[in-house]
Amino acid sequence: MLSFTKSAVSINGENGIFMLTNNTRTLVKCLCAMMVLAFANGSNSVRASQQDWVQLAVHNFGAPINTMWDEGELTFADDGTMVYCSARADLDAAPGDPKDLYIATFNEKTGSWNEPVNMGEPVNAPPATDVDPLRKGDDREPWITGDGQTIYFKSDRTATTTPRNNNDLFVTHLVNGVWTTPELLPAPISTDAGNEHCPMLLQDGESLCFASARAGGYGQSDIWCAQQDANGTWQNPINQGPNINTAANEFHFTQDTDGVVYFTSNRPGGFGAMDLYSSKQLGPNSWTPAVNLGSQVNTESADMCPALPPGGGTLTWFSNRSDSSFGAFDIFWTNKTNLTSTP
C-alpha cells in the first residue's frame, strides 16, 4: 500500500495537489499551474477570483480515474489509496464483466494518479450466467478500512433466481500482499429478500451498516446497522429509524470523525433523481434529522455514494450531472465548506 506525505493528482486536466501530513489530518487541494499563473501575472482581483474558483468549484477527478465508461462508489484508506467501481471494458478481469473493483494510488514522482488496477479474481467474480442468469459478475460498492487491510463490498456471485436473491455482502482481507477469497457475510446480514448493498463500518469500528430492502423497514431500501457478539456472530441488524430512513430509498453511509454521516436518498424535496444528505450521530442507532447537502453537490441529475478522503476537508461522490465529461457517471470532489447544510 502506498504511504506518502505529499502527492499530486490530475483533476480534469488540471494539476491539483493533495497535501497530507503523516497522520493525514489535513487535506489541501489547489490548482497549482493556474494559481502560479494568476499570482505571477494577475491582479489582486484575479488572484482572489482564482482562489474563490478553486475553493468553491466542484471538480471532476479526471483521467485515469474517470473514463468513457461509468465510474463511482469510491472509498479511501487512511494512506489515500482509493478503491472504486468501474464499468471500463479495457481492464476487465473477465470478458463481459459489467462492474469490477479497482485500486488506484498516487504517484509522487509523476504528480498524478497511477493507472487504476483491476483487483482481479478472486475479488472480482467472472460472469456465471450459465449457473444462474443473475450472476453477471457485478462486484460493486466497496468500503475499505482505514488500515487498508479489509474491504467490504456487494456482489451478485451467489445470486439465485429462486428464491430471488440479487446481491449479498462479502469481505476480503489483505494477507501477505494478497487479497483473500471473499467470504459471505451470512444471515442475518445477507438475506434472500433484502438485496443488501453499500456496506461500511462506523467510526467505532464495530458497527457494520448497510442498505437493505428487508421486511420491517420504512420504505424501499433502508439503512441498517449490526454488531458482532463476543463469539463473532452477527446480531440482528437494527433499522436506523425515521431520522435516516423514509418511504423512499436510503443507502451508502459514510461517517467522518465528528460523527456526521453522509448518505444517498431519493426522498421527496430533493434537487434531483438522487441527492446527498447528512446527519449526526447522537448515540447508538440514534441520529439527528437528515439535511440535504444543498445545490453545491446536488443537481437535477443523480448525485450518489459520498466518500471522505483522508484529512476530512473534502467530499467525493459520483454523478451523471451535465458536466460528467468523461462518461455517463464520473467521480467528483468539492471542499466540505461548500456544503449548504450540515447537522
Where do the protein language model's features map onto the residues?
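Accessible peptide chain termini
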Residues: 1-2, 343
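Serine residues within intrinsically disordered or low-complexity segments
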Residues: 3, 7-10, 43
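Secreted/luminal cysteine- and crosslink-motif detector
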Residues: 4, 31-33, 210
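Bacterial N-terminal signal peptides that target proteins for export
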Residues: 8-31
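Bacterial N-terminal signal peptides
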Residues: 30-41
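Short, conserved micro-motifs composed of acidic
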Residues: 46-343
